[in-house]
């Protein structure tokens, strides 16, 4: 099997040229069209970009077929891409642009009116369409394509300083991940994959590349649909899905609809979950509703290419453990549980930090050598990553035991609580704050902000909360904004003078 992602995707243009690689809301893109358009765009980039190929290309948009064309065209020109979704606030986009130092900023949709990109060329949607037309029929030099350990994509995740970090994923990383998904999860040719996550979220890689590499069809549910439950419940059975890829929270939302079942979705027999804890209650209800389906629980950080462990969730597994296991490590990886202080590898049954070693592990953070050295290291010639996750191995399965720091998963998004706190402290009405995750059914249900406010003239607390949220939305993504607000005159402190987070946590999670 060829190791080139692009060659394997392009091969479907010969095998099944008219089969849709993307289909949604009347928009259809065939494998032949994907190849021709990405060839044209790759040719355009090779002829017009003279900058260092180490500099990535930012692709701005939202789950459209044009984003796929831009991704693959960038790869064919030898440059990694950075997906940036339209839902991101302007300040976040500016932070990513500054950190990535891109060679080009591609707009597959219009930029917000209050965002101006400087310091690199910008390609508008009209210019992109014009480039595809002018270079139609051209084929870029295969030698120019991203290969081996070259960066393939870079996804920005939450950083503890308030600035996002760019995780570099190479072609080799992506090949390892994609081969594992297709083989271990028994995904055959021509299946229809749900695309729930925006491309700026690495969960999307779990549907995008397994779909394209197996000659399948990517079926996105964009933000206009997922924001309206009636539309969502109507659309899901209409899409004739075979493979479900989402966060558990999204499945919980769909399970609120009594019609979300096997009868109305007869082909839906593969469920793949990642991004947060899969509760036993969710898995059990899915098995009730979809008796023909196979459910997989997976685990992995962005730094190890989406996911590295898997377990098939059966009634026996649900009944055997108090919480669902994360599964077993993929064949070309090793997993150690280590003592966080000494680095000593711990035996089965002891809790410690999860360390991942092998083919899926990223080379590090783009343009951030110090942050890279803090968590990435060489282990006997293999790349290794300290996850900051606490875990334990029982019966050969990995079990998640929470975060060792202030990082959590909420609705599939990885969030540094310090990131939120640093951003909240920018708000004029906040003197000090602490963010506490409220737990429900073994996972984070919502974020609670405990706040010491500055002097203000609001009569009611809800008025203060509204004013704070109004400021926050200018520079923080919606999923990071706390849902509940508690106001205090002072915080409890530990003996060494730090905020007593255990005390605050016990208040929130009584």
UniProtKB/Swiss-Prot annotation:
Q: Which UniProt keywords apply?
A: ATP-binding, Cytoplasm, Ligase, Nucleotide-binding
A GO molecular function for this record? D-alanine [D-alanyl carrier protein] ligase activity
Question: Which EC number(s) does the record attach to this protein?
Answer: 6.2.1.54
Originating gene: dltA
Look up the domain of life of the source. Answer: Bacteria
The record, for InterPro entries, names: AA_adenyl_dom, AMP-bd_C, AMP-bd_C_sf, AMP-binding_CS, AMP-dep_synth/lig_dom, ANL_N_sf, DltA, DltA-like
Which protein family is named in the record?
Belongs to the ATP-dependent AMP-binding enzyme family. DltA subfamily.
Q: Which residues bind D-alanine?
A: 202, 306, 498
Instruction: Cite the PANTHER family for this sequence.
Output: ENZYME, PUTATIVE (JCVI)-RELATED, PTHR45398
The species this protein was found in: Listeria monocytogenes serotype 4b (strain CLIP80459)
The answer, when asked if Repeat is one of the entry's keywords, is no
Q: Where in the cell is it found?
A: Cytoplasm
**Binding-site list for ATP:** 157-158, 297-302, 389, 498
Q: Which reaction does it catalyse?
A: holo-[D-alanyl-carrier protein] + D-alanine + ATP = D-alanyl-[D-alanyl-carrier protein] + AMP + diphosphate
Q: In which pathway does it act?
A: Cell wall biogenesis; lipoteichoic acid biosynthesis
A GO biological-process term:
lipoteichoic acid biosynthetic process
Enzyme's top EC category: ligase
**Gene Ontology cellular component list:** cytoplasm
Chief site of localization: cytoplasm
Name under which the protein is recorded: D-alanine--D-alanyl carrier protein ligase
């Amino acid at each position: 099997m060829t190791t080139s992602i692009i060659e394997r995707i392009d091969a479907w243009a010969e095998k099944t040229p008219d089969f849709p690689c993307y289909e949604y809301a009347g928009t259809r893109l065939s494998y032949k069209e994907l190849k021709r358009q990405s060839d044209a765009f790759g040719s355009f980039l090779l002829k017009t970009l003279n900058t260092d190929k180490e500099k990535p290309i930012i692709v701005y948009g939202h789950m459209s077929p044009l984003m796929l064309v831009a991704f693959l065209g960038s790869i064919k020109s030898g440059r990694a891409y950075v997906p940036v979704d339209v839902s991101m606030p302007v300040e976040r986009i500016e932070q990513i642009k500054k950190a990535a130092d891109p060679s080009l900023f591609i707009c597959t949709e219009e930029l917000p009116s209050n965002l101006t990109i400087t310091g690199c060329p910008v390609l508008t949607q009209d210019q992109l369409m014009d480039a595809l037309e002018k270079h139609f029929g051209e084929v870029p030099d295969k030698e120019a394509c991203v290969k081996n350990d070259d960066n393939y994509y870079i996804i920005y995740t939450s950083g503890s300083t308030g600035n996002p970090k760019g995780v570099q994923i190479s072609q080799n990383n992506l090949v390892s991940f994609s081969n594992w998904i297709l083989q271990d999860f028994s995904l055959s040719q021509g299946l229809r994959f749900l695309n729930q996550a925006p491309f700026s979220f690495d969960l999307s890689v779990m549907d995008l590349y397994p779909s394209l590499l197996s000659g399948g069809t990517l079926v996105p549910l964009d933000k206009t649909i997922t924001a309206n439950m009636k539309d969502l419940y109507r659309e899901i059975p209409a899409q004739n899905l075979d493979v479900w890829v989402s966060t558990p929270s999204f499945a919980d939302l769909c399970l609120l609809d009594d019609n979300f079942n096997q009868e109305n979705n007869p082909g839906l027999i593969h469920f793949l979950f990642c991004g947060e804890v899969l509760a036993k209650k969710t898995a059990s209800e899915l098995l009730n509703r979809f008796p023909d389906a196979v459910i997989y629980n997976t685990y992995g950080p962005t730094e190890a290419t989406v996911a590295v462990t898997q377990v098939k969730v059966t009634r026996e597994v649900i009944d055997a453990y108090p919480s669902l296991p994360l599964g077993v490590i993929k064949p070309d990886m090793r997993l150690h549980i280590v003592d966080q202080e000494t680095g000593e590898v711990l035996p089965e049954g002891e809790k410690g930090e999860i360390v991942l070693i092998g083919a899926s592990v990223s080379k590090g953070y783009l343009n951030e050598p110090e942050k890279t050295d803090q968590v990435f290291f060489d282990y006997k010639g293999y790349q290794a990553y300290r996850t900051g996750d606490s875990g334990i191995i029982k019966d050969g399965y990995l079990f998640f035991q929470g975060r060792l720091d202030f990082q959590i998963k909420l609705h599939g998004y990885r969030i540094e609580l310090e990131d939120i706190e640093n951003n909240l402290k920018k708000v004029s009405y906040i003197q000090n704050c602490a963010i506490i995750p409220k737990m429900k059914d073994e996972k984070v249900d919502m974020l609670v902000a405990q706040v010491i406010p500055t002097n203000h003239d609001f009569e009611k607390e809800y008025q203060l909360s509204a004013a704070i949220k109004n400021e926050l939305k200018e520079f923080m993504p919606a999923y990071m904004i706390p849902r509940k607000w508690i106001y205090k005159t002072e915080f409890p402190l530990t003996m060494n003078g730090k905020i007593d987070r255990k005390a605050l946590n016990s208040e929130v999670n009584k």
